[in-house]
């Protein structure tokens, strides 16, 4: 029987490449692959009742660190809490039991702080009988090490929790490893966002890029300007209250994840205008107002008064040092049609180059954000249109046409870069497109070593035109996992075949933990997803 969309030869090739059936008995399958892994054939057993996670005697963090206490509870449950299989009769227990994981934080723990771009996520993990040791400079490394430790443990054919003696040294290749979610095209319930944060932690992502508002809706509930969401959201039940936002930020912090909001302007702002009078530019048709509106009006003082107050609030709500300001896809037609803007352009000597007007607006906005002690991230058009950027402004490269050239130009100008162009997960295709994401290397462009140091990482972007809570998780995972390993693991971890074998197991592990990750290909999981 011919498979629709595949020739016989292609189908046979796919079947030949299928991974071993992903079951717990497959042993540990680490994802993302650590920097250095040494494993021994010597096996240790664990039991729920006899195993515990505690602190080493020299640890700077202890039982008062709620972040770690919550993580210990969470990972104990991840390891033992899904043991629902019918077991075979127990075999004679010949292996030595692993009784404890001792965690040591070496430096100031940062237990009550928020993660940032320079947070230390490195750790070492030594698993030997009768006690395993996890050591990290900060709590952020402990979180990453706990995830790795949990992945080392599997159940053998008798259902016994088993781990190989192991010695692991690990740290991330890039400091910025993000997922973009879009809550403007479709509202995503807080529960869905929290589930995404769980999955991000399983894949060692550390940035949630929250594209929170756009043309279609303004669900962010501003205390200073409540009419923005009252009139700009889809409905009053489709908003994120201050408590909702705080819940997301704190849930992320407990998993070592930063939350960076994006308030894109001057374009992508139609929803803003519904609740903020005179913010948008009136468009004209044959010398009369057409009744439609374009980008934010860049020539009014009231615009910048509003932006100053709004971003002052944003700076207090979101603790991360960076705010994403967008700046992409600004359409100039409405500005061109408006006689007041034409007069302003003439007064400023801008001629008919509306990129200079865009630059005028964005430079003022960058200054406002700097005044509230925040750094800025912008989409690549802001750089391409020669806006004068403040030092340290991060440029996010998203256009897929020769993105390597864009990386070269931005880094040559001395600006840090986030790469997203090859990782737009909303562009779905038949088959195993995760392989294409996996093969990308952010540093494969023509540039000096100093330039390549400016590539701080990347993001997998899932835009929301066709995504809501019903398909958010399976569309993200495990496709985003491929990006996660590329951004965490060493440059020489490139074998797609090896990745496939590990990722099928990791996908089942996510399913076991309640993440509805879609399958990579044919096969099964010992713990199938329960709705």
UniProtKB/Swiss-Prot annotation:
Its EC number(s): 3.2.1.52
Regulation: Addition of GM2A stimulates the hydrolysis of sulfated glycosphingolipid SM2 and the ganglioside GM2.
InterPro entries: Beta_hexosaminidase_sua/sub, Glyco_hydro_20_cat, Glycoside_hydrolase_SF, Hex-like_dom2, HEX_eukaryotic_N
Primary location group: other
GO biological process terms, semicolon-separated: carbohydrate metabolic process; ganglioside catabolic process; glycosaminoglycan metabolic process; N-glycan processing; single fertilization
GO cellular component, one term: membrane
UniProt KW keywords: Cytoplasmic vesicle, Disulfide bond, Glycoprotein, Glycosidase, Hydrolase, Lipid metabolism, Lysosome, Signal
One family name in Pfam for this protein: Glyco_hydro_20
EC supergroup of this enzyme: hydrolase
Superkingdom classification of source: Eukaryota
Annotated S-S bridges: 65-111, 283-334, 508-525
Localization of this protein: Lysosome; Cytoplasmic vesicle, Secretory vesicle, Cortical granule
CDD domains: GH20_HexA_HexB-like
A GO molecular-function annotation: beta-N-acetylhexosaminidase activity
Catalytic activity entry: Hydrolysis of terminal non-reducing N-acetyl-D-hexosamine residues in N-acetyl-beta-D-hexosaminides; N-acetyl-beta-D-galactosaminyl-(1->4)-beta-D-3-sulfogalactosyl-(1->4)-beta-D-glucosyl-(1<->1')-ceramide + H2O = a beta-D-3-sulfogalactosyl-(1->4)-beta-D-glucosyl-(1<->1')-ceramide + N-acetyl-beta-D-galactosamine; a ganglioside GM2 (d18:1(4E)) + H2O = a ganglioside GM3 (d18:1(4E)) + N-acetyl-beta-D-galactosamine; a ganglioside GM2 + H2O = a ganglioside GM3 + N-acetyl-beta-D-galactosamine
Protein's job: Hydrolyzes the non-reducing end N-acetyl-D-hexosamine and/or sulfated N-acetyl-D-hexosamine of glycoconjugates, such as the oligosaccharide moieties from proteins and neutral glycolipids, or from certain mucopolysaccharides. The isozyme B does not hydrolyze each of these substrates, however hydrolyzes efficiently neutral oligosaccharide. Only the isozyme A is responsible for the degradation of GM2 gangliosides in the presence of GM2A. During fertilization is responsible, at least in part, for the zona block to polyspermy.
Subunit-level organization: There are 3 forms of beta-hexosaminidase: hexosaminidase A is a heterodimer composed of one subunit alpha and one subunit beta (chain A and B); hexosaminidase B is a homodimer of two beta subunits (two chains A and B); hexosaminidase S is a homodimer of two alpha subunits. The composition of the dimer (isozyme A versus isozyme S) has a significant effect on the substrate specificity of the alpha subunit active site.
Disease: Defects in HEXB are responsible for Sandhoff disease (GM2-gangliosidosis type-II). This disorder is found in Korat cats (initially imported from Thailand).
Protein name: Beta-hexosaminidase subunit beta
């Amino acid at each position: 029987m011919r498979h629709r969309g595949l020739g016989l030869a292609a189908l046979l090739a796919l079947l030949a490449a299928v991974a071993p059936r992903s079951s717990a008995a497959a042993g540990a399958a680490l994802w993302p692959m650590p920097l250095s892994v040494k494993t021994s054939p010597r096996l240790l057993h664990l039991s729920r009742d006899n195993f515990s996670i505690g602190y080493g005697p020299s640890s700077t963090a202890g039982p008062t660190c709620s972040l770690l206490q919550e993580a210990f509870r969470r990972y104990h449950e991840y390891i033992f809490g899904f043991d629902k299989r019918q077991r075979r009769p127990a075999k004679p227990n010949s292996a030595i039991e692993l009784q404890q994981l001792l965690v040591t934080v070496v430096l100031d723990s940062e237990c009550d702080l928020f993660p940032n771009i320079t947070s230390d996520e490195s750790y070492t993990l030594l698993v030997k009988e009768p006690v395993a040791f996890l050591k990290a400079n900060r709590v952020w490394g402990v979180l990453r090490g706990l995830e790795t430790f949990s992945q080392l443990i599997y159940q053998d054919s008798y259902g016994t929790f088993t781990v190989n003696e192991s010695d692991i040294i690990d740290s991330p290749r890039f400091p910025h490893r993000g997922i973009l979610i879009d809550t403007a095209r479709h509202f995503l319930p807080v529960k869905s966002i929290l589930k995404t944060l769980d999955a991000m932690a399983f894949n060692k992502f550390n940035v949630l890029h929250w594209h929170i508002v756009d043309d279609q809706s303004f669900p962010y509930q501003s205390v200073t300007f409540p009419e923005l969401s009252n009139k700009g959201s889809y409905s009053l039940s489709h908003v994120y209250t201050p408590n909702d936002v705080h819940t997301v930020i704190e849930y992320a912090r407990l998993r070592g994840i930063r939350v960076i909001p994006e308030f894109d302007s001057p374009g992508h702002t139609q929803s803003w205008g519904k609740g903020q009078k005179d913010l948008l530019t009136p468009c004209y048709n044959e010398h009369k107002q057409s009744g439609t509106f374009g980008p934010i009006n860049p020539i009014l003082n009231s615009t910048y008064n509003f932006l100053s107050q709004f971003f002052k609030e944003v700076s207090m709500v979101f603790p991360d040092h960076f705010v994403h300001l967008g700046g992409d896809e600004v359409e100039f037609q409405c500005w061109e049609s408006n006689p007041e803007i034409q007069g302003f352009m003439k007064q400023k000597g801008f001629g008919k180059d509306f990129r200079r007007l865009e630059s005028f607006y964005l430079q003022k906005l960058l200054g406002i954000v700097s005044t509230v002690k925040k750094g800025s991230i912008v989409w690549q058009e802001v750089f391409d249109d020669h806006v004068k950027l403040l030092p340290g402004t991060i440029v996010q490269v998203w256009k897929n046409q020769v993105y390597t050239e864009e990386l070269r130009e931005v880094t040559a100008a001395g600006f840090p870069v986030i790469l997203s162009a090859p990782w737009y997960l909303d562009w779905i295709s038949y088959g195993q497109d995760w392989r294409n994401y996996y093969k990308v290397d952010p540093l494969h462009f023509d540039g000096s070593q100093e330039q390549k140091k400016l590539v701080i990482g990347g993001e997998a972007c899932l835009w929301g035109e066709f995504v809501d809570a019903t398909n958010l998780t399976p569309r993200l995972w495990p496709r985003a996992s491929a990006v996660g390993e590329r951004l965490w693991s060493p440059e020489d971890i490139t074998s797609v075949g090896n990745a496939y074998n590990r990722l099928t197991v990791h996908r089942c592990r996510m399913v076991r933990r309640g993440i509805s990750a879609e399958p990579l290909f044919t096969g099964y999981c010992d713990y199938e997803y329960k709705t």
